[in-house]
Amino acid sequence: MDKTPVNISPNLIKHYADYLRLELSLSDNSVEAYCHDVNLFLQYLEVEKISADINTITQETIDNFFAYLFDLSIGATSQARILSGLKSFWRYLTQENLTETDPTLLIPSPSMGRHLPEVLSYEEIQKMIDSIDLSQPTGHRNKAMIEVMYGCGLRVSELIGLQISDIYRNDGFLRIIGKGSKERLVPIGDSSLKILFQYIEGARLHITPKPKFTDTVFLNSRGTSLTRQMVFLIVKDLAEKNGITKVISPHTFRHSFATHLLEGGANLLAVQQMLGHASVSTTEIYTHISDELLRDTLTSYHPRFRKI
């Protein structure tokens, strides 16, 4: 028998606050901090149009939430505190027999080395792109989306907000409106640009945009902008189709873009500018993955590190 839905709601959070205050004897400041973490997660679910039923929230949901926080430049220390708050909340839910599962149980703390979501290899990304069925009405659109996310390192909000007038075709640049309405120019490679215009000058012409969306690049079948959740589902479907078991989201292509550039020797400041990071310290996190690549290379190929 299916469980009765139990949604994360202001009323449930109020009961949780009472539990913290009365059962655990926490101070008002501590109670406020713990409830803030749960409210932040609830806001994320609302923005992404994800069900707030605690029995449908999975580890993947939590992982994608932290990928979202990372993309907002929320540091590892703050992420660790938020994760602690969510773990406390789910302990309360299980103690109250509101759920039998805890999606936070196996998620490591960012302070223990969890700074980034999974990164896809170039081969995995190419495999996903090659598997897209171009005979379907959405095929060329989805292919162009993956190309632009990986080829330009865009946030999902920047992808779905991209306008045709923001594409400088002759110069090979995109004008991106990022966080805080800050503008930046991001180069786009010839192959990605070609695939993008195959969609714009092909499949997109068969969709009649609604009045407010005539300049929007990526449209749904109703002629309006895609939502974050639609992009997430497209990415998830492609990953499953290709047997990719890594926990990924649209943000993964942005992280892969940055990591592959730095692994190839790109200038850190140039990558910072392309990503639209306010501080280079945020971009520097990606160098940890490059360090791991160097260590793997050393242990695999250097005679002093080979196993005898």
Label the predicted regions:
Residues 1-308:
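Conserved catalytic core of the tyrosine transesterase superfamily
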